[in-house]
From Swiss-Prot:
It comes from the Bacteria. The keyword Manganese does not apply. One of the early assembly proteins it binds 23S rRNA. One of the proteins that surrounds the polypeptide exit tunnel on the outside of the ribosome. Forms the main docking site for trigger factor binding to the ribosome. The keyword Ribonucleoprotein applies. Part of the 50S ribosomal subunit. Contacts protein L29, and trigger factor when it is bound to the ribosome. GO terms for molecular function: rRNA binding; structural constituent of ribosome. Keywords: Ribonucleoprotein, Ribosomal protein, RNA-binding, rRNA-binding. One of its GO terms (cellular component) is ribosome. This is Large ribosomal subunit protein uL23.
Amino acid sequence: MAKFDPRNLPDLVRRPILTEKATIMMEQNKYTFEVTPKASKPQIRAAIEDLFQVKVVKVNTALPPRRKKRVGKFIGFKPQYKKAIVTIAPGDVDKIRQVLFPEV
């Protein structure tokens, strides 16, 4: 298991990813987050459990390739990010939905 400081856990999760595919996966208790590229699966699990007070069943990660971005004649790259697909225990789905989608 990776060593990490519990005080830095909230910094690992940047934002939730809300796309059409991610919304469909929410019906299967899978939530997608953008995390820091150097975060490991145990760190992501601990961060999600700490932030949302839920039980994480499984963590899948993907490191998509960087995309090129052109500004005038210069070619650069968009910043690299890591995508984490987190499976939540069926009993804890209401807790995470209340935090991510508060009722107005």
